[in-house]
Amino acid sequence: MQEIQIIDSDLIGSLVTKAKQAERKRTNHNFHEQKEVYQRFLNVLSKNTYISPHRHLSDPKPETFVVLEGEIGFLIFSEDGNIKESHKLSSNGPKRGIDLQPGVWHSLVCLTDVAVCFEGKSGPYDPTVDKEFHPKYPLEGDSKVKETIQYFESLFI
């Protein structure tokens, strides 16, 4: 890993292109090695990407999101899957980021053509225990994803 890494317009521009071309309509750019205890990365989202509501409980980890470009709708869910809170996060403010304790059900939706977020959480990353998905909501690839995205977006109009 490089000693320093600069977050500049060239890096963001290349990641935006990559996210728009990706099947999942998003991409991550890691600044860390997978085994590091502090995971930090850019999460670049394009419109209509879907992030199934989830939490980090089995391997409890706090998370921090800061929007560097664009806007996202950040959703917090109750245990039964009802939406408890919604926060519009924007690079222009007034809300620019959010910090979550482990075990909080959450999701986010991209409200602009593209959104670039800096995300930090505890590591190391282990995909087998990283996330628990909420059973009330569809997983990626499900036929109800488009409808769910539209519903999430409607909460921020």
Question: Language-model features: where?
Answer:
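Double-stranded beta-helix
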Residues: 82, 107-157
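A short, N-terminal "cap"/entry segment at the start of jelly-roll beta-barrel domains
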Residues: 1-39, 85-90, 149-157
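His/acidic/aromatic-lined binding-pocket segments of jelly-roll/cupin-type domains
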Residues: 41-43, 62-67, 98, 108
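Glycine- and acidic-residue-biased ligand/ion/polar-headgroup-sensing regions
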Residues: 60-79
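Short beta-strand His + acidic residue motifs that chelate non-heme Fe in jelly-roll/DSBH
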Residues: 53, 74-76, 98-100, 106-111, ...
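Non-cytosolic beta-sheet module surface loops
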Residues: 33, 55-57, 110
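Conserved short histidine dyad/triad with adjacent acidic residue
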Residues: 25, 42-61
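Short acidic-glycine-tyrosine-enriched beta hairpin
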Residues: 64, 78-103
